[in-house]
Amino acid sequence: MKPDAHQVKQFLLNLQDTICQQLSAVDGAEFVEDSWQREAGGGGRSRVLRNGGVFEQAGVNFSHVHGEAMPASATAHRPELAGRSFEAMGVSLVVHPHNPYVPTSHANVRFFIAEKPGAEPVWWFGGGFDLTPFYGFEEDAIHWHRTARDLCLPFGEDVYPRYKKWCDEYFYLKHRNEQRGIGGLFFDDLNTPDFDHCFAFMQAVGKGYTDAYLPIVERRKAMAYGERERNFQLYRRGRYVEFNLVWDRGTLFGLQTGGRTESILMSMPPLVRWEYDYQPKDGSPEAALSEFIKVRDWV
């Protein structure tokens, strides 16, 4: 089947609505919407929930940008895109909870298509979701990865292991020699065997995110915590900022190509702290995190 960008856009708009409704139902607060237009073509809907009952900040962004030609930074890596008009659309979200026992989560699904008259379109899907705990709970990690594995199974037995590995490799802070969290799924450049198959997989990932995340939120949101746990959460959020500004391809691409800065940086935690040469106490739950986030097979 020929790629249908309109069908993908409708799914993404509905996905943004659904995820916002689900997060609001857990939190009790509502999202505030900020619609925006891009001068060069396209626009989006940024939605943010701040200082809710459960979430300190949750941002769910939809964007759809288009143009007559790709930026040089993109065609340098993919010369086949030169001289083509393009559309790029996606939903991207990050949730930063109040409670340090509730992990931070991130999800993204996206579609890209570049066309020119008389030629076959170049298109692909990408996306995934990943979890960043501050305190490790094995049952949460197993549930997260089991949900990821189960949504992948209809698409092939090799899909989950392949995209889990890609996620582990992508969300890695080289300058710290550590993972950002416990991973999940990450895929890009997906365009085989055909459009329908790839679109169905992207939909499964988009819908699977809340199945993976919300049970963990419900399990942990009422756990008692104090200043020690909060300080550790803020310290570990620093790793999130470091990854996004130093290593994340999407953030860098957006900032380098004149994307909407407010939406791109919506993923940042509202409060964060750094501490020189921080060393957690031996045997403490904080010290256990470095071992917990090391790459392993959870299911």
Curated annotation (Swiss-Prot):
Annotated family: Belongs to the aerobic coproporphyrinogen-III oxidase family.
Pfam family, one: Coprogen_oxidas
MF-aspect GO terms: coproporphyrinogen oxidase activity; manganese ion binding; protein homodimerization activity
Record: active site: H106 (proton donor)
Matching InterPro entries: Coprogen_oxidase_aer, Coprogen_oxidase_aer_sf, Coprogen_oxidase_CS
Chain positions covered by the region annotation Important for dimerization: 240-275
Site features described as Important for dimerization, chain residue numbers: H175
Gene assigned in the entry: hemF
Record protein name field: Oxygen-dependent coproporphyrinogen-III oxidase
UniProt record, GO biological process: protoporphyrinogen IX biosynthetic process
Catalytic activity entry: coproporphyrinogen III + O2 + 2 H(+) = protoporphyrinogen IX + 2 CO2 + 2 H2O
Binding site for Mn(2+): H96, H106, H145, H175
Subunit structure: Homodimer.
Organism annotation: Escherichia coli O1:K1 / APEC
EC number: 1.3.3.3
